[in-house]
């Protein structure tokens, strides 16, 4: 029998400091939810078996070995497991690749693996406006000798100077080119782009670059985006004071430019509503109006009426998933819409009517109930009973910035800076203790956002999932790094620092960092620690002249002194993170239940006719590591593999290459900034 076609393509786009840790869970849930939406559950189909069109996730081979190194045998030829699959999902992978020169310049400031790259790039180099994707990276200098690390209270999130953000613009171009590859294979294929965190900035920028190519995706789902619409932000203005545009303006991207850019994005997607295929064609290929088990079936018309925006269409839609508990993009210098959502006024000012919808994922608040209600941030927060932290919006309370002498000394590369860090410590310790500026912003008093996404077939309370277990509270408290250790590990060597660390309780006594993970989560922890150790080793003079760190290289030999230092550092990193706050930043997408019950109803539905060979080629193209080796040289996008291979494009530094040609900033991404260019002769 002929297999029922897939309903379209869904592209996942991860954020910074990430290799798509949510991809597998979200794909699993999405496939299950689409089986329900399309009436393809086993009991609903007349014919048994997986070959009838029931959606099955695509499985991928592990990327790391147990020691936390990249598996050298993994390649474009075997990164997809051979087991049967029938999935609409493509995993888009992107990041920062350091040249040999970059390793010497930035290797002591950013995480890099043994091949000198990092998925999503450094955590500290995120941004809150699309125009910033074409600017210099973070400048960690606050004032004279003071750096961001002097005041950073979050362990494991070192903030140092970062490389140019051109790798974001390059990733956006690759995503736009991937959209073109799909459209070239099937012009009317439904495409939904699902973005998380900083991946939203890549995804939105790709929409503008795709428009330049004459193509576009049909739907976007924006999860936890850092895109900020707050009118004023003095903290971000100060951080961005050295950032300039072509007109010589400096500082934060202006409020008006942010609104105009988002309005331009909405216009691009709104135009896709008219590209939905005729209902008759969808029904001819996919209808199941009377399932075998007597349950409600699927027809295009009923699907659009129930789950389409305004009961009309499943194309031409942007859906925002925001989380009021997100402790990453609620940072005072960011305040993204993935935390605070969009108010009715902001929706109106950006022309969101008829294209924009939003869902709130919050503790004890049902997702998918009938729309027309407002989510009141403070009112919902004050419903907590019992309330462990009365008066604080954040649970636990947001950590206050405080003067950290050791961090400040480490962050300064000059002797003068180190000396001044010590001499000024008494003053700044008292001053920061008195000010008690918090890392995370609070919502404005009375802040409300409308919940206007279509009702779901089954509303549900969101659940955070850690190490395969559902948590009682969606707004989690602590998330110690040590939990990622393998709970079933046996025969660990006695000198292993992950074993030596033991078990430590959190400061509230309610939790601990006892191992809850498996071999994969521990491998990921070791992988991240190796990157952190490389950075520390370069900063402390323990690296080779070329920046390499033999003790963190597969097959490399470490001296006894380095091994002792390494063991001490790992134990300290684990200890420092015992009281790490749960970020609640990936909670929406790491639970497959959320994708099954919500995401599956927010994607565009149509008929996808891509062949199995098409799917494999597209999945190879979507992974920046495999373009050169996995695509034929005749492929129109083969050339994009140069960046991962060398750190250059057209043999130019990436920041030079993106200034002109296909990767230049589109005019629809507006770049006006807070401070005007100084007049000639003006006093400085």
Question: Where are the language model's segments positioned?
Answer:
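Gly/Ala-rich beta-loop-alpha elbow adjacent to hydrolase catalytic centers
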Residues: 193-203
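Alpha/beta-hydrolase-fold catalytic nucleophile elbow
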Residues: 95, 223-224, 321
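Terminal low-complexity/disordered tails
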Residues: 1-28, 56-63, 206, 228-233, ...
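A conserved short beta-strand
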Residues: 213-232
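Hydrophobic residues on the short alpha-helix immediately C-terminal to a glycine-rich phosphate/catalytic loop
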Residues: 202-210
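Active-site catalytic motif of lipid deacylating hydrolases and related acyltransferases
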Residues: 13-21, 29-31, 45-187
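Loop/turn elements at helix/coil->beta-strand transitions in domains of secreted/extracellular proteins
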Residues: 5-9, 86-88, 186-191, 215-219, ...
């Amino acid at each position: 029998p002929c297999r029922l076609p897939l309903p379209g393509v869904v592209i996942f786009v991860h954020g910074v400091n990430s290799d798509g840790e949510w991809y597998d869970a979200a794909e699993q849930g999405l496939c299950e939810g689409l089986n329900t939406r399309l009436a393809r559950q086993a009991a609903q189909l007349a014919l048994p078996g997986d070959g009838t069109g029931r959606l099955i996730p695509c499985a991928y081979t592990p990327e790391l070995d147990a020691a936390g190194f990249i598996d050298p045998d993994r390649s474009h030829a075997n990164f997809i497991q051979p087991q049967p699959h029938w999935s609409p999902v493509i995993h888009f992978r992107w990041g920062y690749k350091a040249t040999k020169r970059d390793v010497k310049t930035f290797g002591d400031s950013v995480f890099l693996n043994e091949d000198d790259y990092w998925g999503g790039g450094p955590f500290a180099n995120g941004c809150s406006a699309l125009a910033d994707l074409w600017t210099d990276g973070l400048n960690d200098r606050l004032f004279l000798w003071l750096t961001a690390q002097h005041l950073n209270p979050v362990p494991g999130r070192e903030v140092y100077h970062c490389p140019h953000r051109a790798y974001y613009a390059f990733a956006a171009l690759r995503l736009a080119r991937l959209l073109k590859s799909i459209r070239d294979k099937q012009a009317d294929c439904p495409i939904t782009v699902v973005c998380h965190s900083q991946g939203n900035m890549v995804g939105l920028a790709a929409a503008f670059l795709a428009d330049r190519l004459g193509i576009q995706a049909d739907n976007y789902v924006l999860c936890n985006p850092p895109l900020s619409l707050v009118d004023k932000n003095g903290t971000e203005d100060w951080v961005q004071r050295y950032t300039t545009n072509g007109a010589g303006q400096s500082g934060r991207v202006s409020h008006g430019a942010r609104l105009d850019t988002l309005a331009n994005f909405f216009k691009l997607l709104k135009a896709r509503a008219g590209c939905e295929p005729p209902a008759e064609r969808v029904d001819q290929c996919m209808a199941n109006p009377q399932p075998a088990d007597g349950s409600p079936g699927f027809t295009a018309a009923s699907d659009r009426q129930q789950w389409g925006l305004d009961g009309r269409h499943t194309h031409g839609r942007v859906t925002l998933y925001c989380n009021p508990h997100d402790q990453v993009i609620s940072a005072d210098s960011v305040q993204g819409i993935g935390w605070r959502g969009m108010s009715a006024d902001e929706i109106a000012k950006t022309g969101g009517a008829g294209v924009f919808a939003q869902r709130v994922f919050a503790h004890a608040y049902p997702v998918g109930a009938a729309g027309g209600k407002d989510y009141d941030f403070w009112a919902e927060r004050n419903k907590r009973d019992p309330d462990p932290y009365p008066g604080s919006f954040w649970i636990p309370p947001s950590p206050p910035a405080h003067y950290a002498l050791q961090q400040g000394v480490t962050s300064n590369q000059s002797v003068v800076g180190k000396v001044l860090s010590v001499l000024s410590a008494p003053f700044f310790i008292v001053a920061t203790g008195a000010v008690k500026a918090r890392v995370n912003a609070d919502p404005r008093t009375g802040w409300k956002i409308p919940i206007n996404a279509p009702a779901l077939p089954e509303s549900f309370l969101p659940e955070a999932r850690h190490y395969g277990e559902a948590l009682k509270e969606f707004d989690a408290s602590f998330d110690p790094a040590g939990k990622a250790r393998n709970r079933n590990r046996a025969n660990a060597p006695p000198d292993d620092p992950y074993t030596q660390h033991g078990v430590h309780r959190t400061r509230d006594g309610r939790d601990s960092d006892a191992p809850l993970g498996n071999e994969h989560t521990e491998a990921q922890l070791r992988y991240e620690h190796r990157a952190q150790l490389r950075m520390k080793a370069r900063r402390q003079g323990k690296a080779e002249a070329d920046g390499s760190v033999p003790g963190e290289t597969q097959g490399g030999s470490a001296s006894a002194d380095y091994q002792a230092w390494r063991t001490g550092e790992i134990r300290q990193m684990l200890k420092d993170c015992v009281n790490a706050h749960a970020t609640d930043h990936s909670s929406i997408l790491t639970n497959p239940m959320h994708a099954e019950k919500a995401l599956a109803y927010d994607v565009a539905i149509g008929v996808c006719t891509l062949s199995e060979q098409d799917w494999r080629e597209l999945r190879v193209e979507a992974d920046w590591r495999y373009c050169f080796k996995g695509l034929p040289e005749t492929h129109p996008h083969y050339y994009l593999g140069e960046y991962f291979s060398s750190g250059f494009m057209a043999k130019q530094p990436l920041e030079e290459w993106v200034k002109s040609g296909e990767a230049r900033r589109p005019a629809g991404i507006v770049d006006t900034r807070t401070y005007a260019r100084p007049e000639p002769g003006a006093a400085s």
